[in-house]
Structure formats: structure tokens, C-alpha cells
A protein has these predicted regions:
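Catalytic strand-loop segment that frames the active site of acyl-thioester-processing enzymes
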Residues: 1-34, 51
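Hydrophobic residues in beta-strands and at strand termini
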Residues: 21-22, 67, 117-119
Length: 140
């Protein structure tokens, strides 16, 4: 399992998704479920992938993921994304998750993972991505 990068005290990338974690999103221990969080991360990454591909995409892989801290019910959960690289028909997107309580400005990194998407056509077959990308999508 890869070591989670905690070296940067600020989120990397563009804020793609901000959502309030509710009681219905909690696991039996009372913390927000990891499965719920992965769903939010996939949604955030898909926004970027669909924009880059100018159309439909499919999640091909999710890289290793570990959690630094649990998310409390009532937390504001933010998913930040940045494009790592592009292939002929794929995009690698890093998603960082940060959380904070609504009344607090102090945010904490929760997790990060790399998501790989492929562009697909209407028949769900892999298709090439047009080579042009916007500055907002370009890798660092």
C-alpha cells in the first residue's frame, strides 16, 4: 500500500465537489462510510474526465487508498482534483479529500487516490480523446 502524501498542508488542484456528510452516510461506528467517500471521489474525478474527453467516460481503475482520519457526521467534505496525465483514450486524475466542520476554517486531509478513466462512445467502446486540453485541465 502506498504512503499517503501529507506533506502539503493545502489541497492540490481544483475544488470539484463540496458536500455535507449526513447521518445517513455514516457506518455502524458513527463515522462517515469509506464506501460513501469513494463514491464522492469518483463523482469528482468523473467531472474532470468527462470535460477532458468531451463526452462519456468510464472508471477503469482506482489506485491504493488509505485514510488519515475519520470524517465526522456534519463535516463539510471537499474533493479536489488535478490531472496527472493523459493517454490516447485515458486520463489519470488525482483526487484529494479534505474535511472540516461547518463552523471551523481548519481543514484536514482525509485521503487521496488516483482514478483512471477511459473515454467511451455510445456503444460503450473505448474511443480516443481529442488531443487539445484547456489550461485548467493540464497537468502541473
Amino acid at each position: 500500500m502506498k504512503k499517503l502524501d501529507e506533506s502539503n498542508p493545502e489541497p492540490r488542484g481544483e475544488l470539484q465537489l463540496r458536500i455535507l456528510a449526513n447521518r445517513t452516510d455514516a457506518n455502524i461506528s458513527g463515522d462517515i462510510s469509506g464506501g460513501w467517500l469513494v463514491t464522492q471521489m469518483d463523482s469528482a474525478a468523473s467531472i474532470v474526465a468527462n470535460r477532458i474527453a468531451r463526452g462519456r467516460t468510464a472508471t477503469m481503475a482506482i489506485g491504493d487508498m488509505s485514510f488519515i482520519r475519520p470524517i465526522k457526521v456534519g463535516s463539510v467534505v471537499c474533493c479536489y482534483t488535478h490531472l496527472i496525465s493523459m493517454g490516447r483514450s485515458s486520463a489519470r486524475i488525482m483526487v484529494e479529500v479534505w474535511s472540516r466542520m461547518p463552523e471551523d476554517e481548519l481543514r484536514h486531509k482525509v485521503t487521496e487516490a488516483e482514478f483512471v478513466y477511459v473515454a467511451i462512445d455510445d456503444n460503450r467502446r473505448i474511443r480516443p480523446i481529442e488531443p487539445r486540453i484547456s489550461r485548467a485541465d493540464s497537468p502541473d
